[in-house]
Structure formats: structure tokens, C-alpha cells
Amino acid sequence: MAEGGGGVGVVYVLENEAYLSKEGGTLKVSRRAGREVLLQKPLIAVEEIVILGNAVVTPALLKHCAQEGVGIHYLSPTGTYYAGLTRTPSKNAPARVAQFKAYLEPTWKLALAQRFVLGKIRNGLVFLRRNGAEGWERLKEALLEAERAQDEEALRGAEGRAADLYFRAFAELLPEEFAFGERSRRPPRDPANSLLSLAYTLLAKECESALLVAGLDPYVGYLHEVRYGRPSLALDLMEEFRSVLADSVVLSLLNNRRVTLEDFDDSEGFPRLRKEAWPKFLRAWEGRLNERIQHPLLGKRLAYREILLAQARILVKHLLGELPRYEPFAVR
């Protein structure tokens, strides 16, 4: 089975042993080397391909995607990011030079890390307040602590305390059968954490794509430590969007009973979303990304997917000296 992504050119391939090929100007997704066609879509309308599970991609399609900047992303059934073919960086070399310079200057690096943390805490606070969570006001203390942080250790301490308070309150918003004690990952210990991990993986992928389009290197960040193979800047950028996009989708799916406990399989010792339930999750995810709202800084209505790119470009403007500081996206 294959899912088209809301008219924005994202194709999700859910079928195990799917066969992806290029036939003329068309992407063809079939079962077992062409025996049963699952999806045909003009390649000009394909911006990204997300593969969950095992699939074969023909050399001709790989070549096309590499030449045209179409990302191919491999995820496990639990949403873990395995590998990907991403678009080549833009020609904006000055942006990357400025990015590396900021990373090497401790004061600048700390200031950027602080902006990402503040964006995360502020939006998390608004999210909890809007949803009527008890204890949302406690995040104000962590916010003040982050604002006053003078070094990375203090900043990360404030972020950690804010995250602990946030997830305690978030868990109380969930249906009783999905409540959890703390955030868990690798592997997630309960269905709600499993959905959160999945949503965060997809959000990180979106942020990585936005940064590449804007001309930045997703692997050199400021808040998250730089490690081999870790998209640190993508993880930085996604912080201000965790509650706005990922947590919002998960909360809506669970509270509206669109995803239930029966949609999870724990035969491998941890819960994971059944293949049959993936379309429900992906429809909700794409629906949220395509939702349009007013961007507070730019003063115009944009889809959330466009806002991710807008924020990446705002970061570029700051790095190049066109803005005095990076302004995180803020919900009202």
C-alpha cells in the first residue's frame, strides 16, 4: 500500500516488499516487482518518498531522485530513521560558512541554543494552557531559568526540567488507557510514547529538508551535540515545533479515539503501530502540516510545512547578520 501526502508531493510507502520504479515520467509503486500496481504518480509532483519497512528502489528511480533533489527516507515500522537519500545542499555557501562560524564561537553558539530552548518551552506552555492541562504554570519557572542561563550546562538543566514538567502535564491530557509516567524511547515502553517517537522522527525529517533547501548543514547544530550521523541542527529546529505539530497530532488521535490500543502490536516486546493503522496516523500528520496559520513574524498565512522552511530562512538571515537574533516560531 502507498499513501500520497496531501497534495504536497510526499509519498508514503507502507507495503512490505514494495517495488518502486520509474516508468517514463511516472513513479510506479507495485507489489513484488510489478505484479500489482499500488500507486502511480507523475514524478514532477513527487517531492519526497518515505519508505516504512522493506522496499526495492530501482537504479533509474534513484538516479532521478538524486538529480532532481527528491528525498528518499527509510524508516523502521516503529518510526526509527534508518537512512536516506537527501537533496544536495543549495548553492548558498555563505550561509554554511556563517553557520560553522557561529558553531565555533561559544557565545554565539550558546545564544542560538538558548533561542531554540526558549521557543520550545514557550510553545509547550501555550499548548498545555490551551488544552486545559493542570500545572502548565510551572513551566514559567523553567522558562525564566532558561532565559537566565549563562552556560550550556545551566541551559540544558532548565530544558530538562521543563521537559519533565511538560510530559507530566501532557500525560494527564491523554485517555486513561494511554497515560504514561515519563517520556521513554529506544524503545518506547507504551503506545503513547511510541506515537510520540514516530511523530518526532517525521518532524526531524521535515526540518532536515527545510534546512537543506535554505542552504544550511543539518548536521551542525548548537543545542544538540554534534555527532557523526546526527542531524543536530534539524533536532535544534524541531524543538519549537514539538508541541505545535507532533504532540498536537498525537493528542488529537488518541483523545478522538481515531487510534486505539487495538492499533498497536507488542509482539516484539515493545508497542508499535500496526501497519493497518499507519494511514490514520499519516493522514492526521499531513493534515496538520498542511494547516495554514498566520506567521507572527512574516505577517502572512502559511502552511506549517512552509513555516518550517520560513524558520530555516530566518535562521539564515540571522547567521548572515541581517537579523540581530533568531526568532523562534511562536504560537499565540
Swiss-Prot record:
Q: Does the keyword rRNA-binding apply?
A: no
Tell me, what is an example of a GO biological process annotation in this record? maintenance of CRISPR repeat elements
Q: Which cofactor does it need?
A: Mg(2+); Mn(2+)
Q: Which CDD domains match?
A: Cas1_I-II-III
Provide this UniProt record's keywords sorted from A to Z. Answer: Antiviral defense, DNA-binding, Endonuclease, Hydrolase, Magnesium, Manganese, Metal-binding, Nuclease, Plasmid
- Any one Pfam family here would be Cas_Cas1
**Gene3D superfamilies per record:** CRISPR-associated endonuclease Cas1, C-terminal domain (1.20.120.920), CRISPR-associated endonuclease Cas1, N-terminal domain (3.100.10.20)
Instruction: Cite the InterPro entries for this sequence.
Output: Cas1, CRISPR-assoc_Cas1, CRISPR-assoc_Cas1_C, CRISPR-assoc_Cas1_N
> Which residues does the record give as Mn(2+) binding sites?
159, 224, 239
* Self-association and partners: Homodimer, forms a heterotetramer with a Cas2 homodimer.
Give the protein family: Belongs to the CRISPR-associated endonuclease Cas1 family.
**NCBIfam families (alphabetical):** cas1
Q: What is this protein called?
A: CRISPR-associated endonuclease Cas1 3
Tell me which species this is from: Thermus thermophilus (strain ATCC 27634 / DSM 579 / HB8)
